[in-house]
From Swiss-Prot:
This is Cell division topological specificity factor. It comes from Photobacterium profundum (strain SS9). InterPro entries: MinE, MinE_sf. Belongs to the MinE family. Keywords: Cell cycle, Cell division. Pfam families: MinE.
Amino acid sequence: MALLEFFRPKKTTTASVAKERLQIIVAERRSAGQSTPSYLPQLKLDLLEVIRKYVNINPDQVSVNLDQKDEDLSVLELNVTLPEDK
């Protein structure tokens, strides 16, 4: 039975095809030299809006950075300077 399975073509699932396509897109973006994703400015504004619901802060008190540690690891860093309670 194993011999017959050897000659059959492997069936690809839609998940494996989607994963492969996503890996190609990510590799193309990395090779194109796109240092920061286009969504970071909007992400910063959204985070600022959420933080302002609880604390009164200025936009310059929030920084969002995306660091590429190695080929398959990225770190999203969020720094918020909160005012002191009085």
